[in-house]
Amino acid sequence: MKIATTTADFAFYCKTDEERIRELHRAGFRYIDFSMYSFKPDSPYMQENWRDEVQKIKELAESLGMSFVQAHSQGGNPLSENEAEVDFLLKATLRSIEICQLLGIKNTVVHNGVAKGISKEEWFLKNKAFYQKLFPTMERCGVNVLCENSTRVNMGECYFINTGRDMREFVEYVAHPMIHACWDTGHANCEGSQYDEIMALGDELYAIHYNDNHGAKDDHVAPFLGRLNHDEVMCALIDVGFGGYFTLECDTSLVTYNLWTEPRRHFDGGARELKLCEPQLFMQRHIESMMYETAKWMLDSYGIFDE
């Protein structure tokens, strides 16, 4: 199994994707999960010359001996009542699929929507309707769209596909040959044991987001910084016949001041300049190298590491 990680690891520390890709390379990674989670209307990728921007990072990756192997499309809620928000979400998601085609990426994760007070059946119906808007672009570009599990920690009492069984049921309900599943180990760790849930996905498991936490919050930290049972997950991936990349998604291993899951405690320094609010690039570089070496050790331990 080959190791990949997300460009979001350096989203806080670097201004451009070129810089982020170089940092991944520096840490030992050769396979890239391209994050397109936070596009804005003024993003270079949403402009008329977007293909030129994509070509830049493609050529950079090739020059470094790296490959784009997975992606995460625009974040947002397709079931939001804010029409402008949903309109941009759709445009950015379609653009992300087109970008995947140019980069040679075959699988991108597209989050499903959530809404209060709707049943599982209504959720299936509304989210299928959103995915159907992606079908023509998916088919034209040859890019699979993957749904992803979440957790009650994030979704509260709202229905969501938090289990492998429900994910597979939804994939089969959508009934399109280019809709599959991505399993997030951190989200699952907030729910409990996950061996049976991974097995329930079966051959619909096309990608993973590997991250750790303490089971109470969606922390997205590096392996062994939380309580995830790594043997359980590794055995499940082997037993289910998973053939994708071992893709890390541990982009908040270091806590920024306003991190959405757990912001840093506030301190009013008065007239003094506060100097220790944010983690620094040199810290993330250490974390990144550690993540690669840890992932390699994990895969080597089970005899499944592949360069």
Task: Identify what each model region corresponds to.
Residues 6-11, 35-39, 73-76, 113-115, ...:
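Active-site beta-loop-alpha junctions enriched in small/polar residues
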Residues 1-4, 14-28, 161-307:
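Histidine-acidic metal/acid-base catalytic patches
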Residues 33, 70, 109, 146, ...:
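Conserved beta-strand positions in the central sheet of alpha/beta enzyme cores
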Residues 44-48, 83-86, 221-225:
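Short glycine-enriched, charge-decorated loop/helix-capping segments at active-site entrances
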Residues 13, 40-42, 77-79, 118, ...:
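Active-site-proximal flexible loops/turns
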Residues 21-28, 48-70, 94-104, 135-140, ...:
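Acidic (Asp/Glu)-rich catalytic clusters
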Residues 33-58, 118, 155:
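Glycine-rich, proline-tolerant flexible connector loops at the mouths of alpha/beta enzymes
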Residues 59-63, 78-183, 190, 268-274, ...:
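Active-site acidic/histidine proton-transfer and metal-coordination neighborhood
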